[in-house]
Amino acid sequence: MIQMQSYLDVADNSGAKEVMCIKVLGGSKRRYARIGDIIKVTVKDAIPRGKVKKGEVYDAVVVRTRKGVRRADGSLIRFDGNAAVLLNNKQEPIGTRIFGPVTRELRSEKFMKIVSLAPEVL
């Protein structure tokens, strides 16, 4: 579960290393984001010649959480850390590569690009 002030790793090659959630999108009283939810983030740590700079604000989709996701068959998929993929204004990934596994829950029409770029889909 991601909330405001949560730090997340970045799972793409956009140039950001770490981001902080500043808003969970989708309703005025919405507190938590799960896998597949869109959040507003600010870049806290970035590499020198990346596509994004420290302090910039972007949308991001949550791809991994320590809380995990419960499947219909009762299984639970958990990860060691929280991670997100940065999105541009058209809700497309900024990076051209995705690092680490992503879950099948991202297989909606909006995020098929992320699923196809990911090295492993759980």
UniProtKB/Swiss-Prot annotation:
UniProt key word Ribonucleoprotein: yes
InterPro entries per the UniProt record, alphabetical: Ribosomal_uL14 (IPR000218), Ribosomal_uL14_bac-type (IPR005745), Ribosomal_uL14_CS (IPR019972), Ribosomal_uL14_sf (IPR036853)
Record key words, sorted: Ribonucleoprotein, Ribosomal protein, RNA-binding, rRNA-binding
Pfam family, one: Ribosomal_L14
Gene Ontology terms, MF aspect: large ribosomal subunit rRNA binding; structural constituent of ribosome
One of the GO BP terms on file: translation
Role played: Binds to 23S rRNA. Forms part of two intersubunit bridges in the 70S ribosome.
Oligomer and partners: Part of the 50S ribosomal subunit. Forms a cluster with proteins L3 and L19. In the 70S ribosome, L14 and L19 interact and together make contacts with the 16S rRNA in bridges B5 and B8.
HAMAP family (alphabetical): Ribosomal_uL14 (MF_01367)
Name by which UniProt lists this protein: Large ribosomal subunit protein uL14
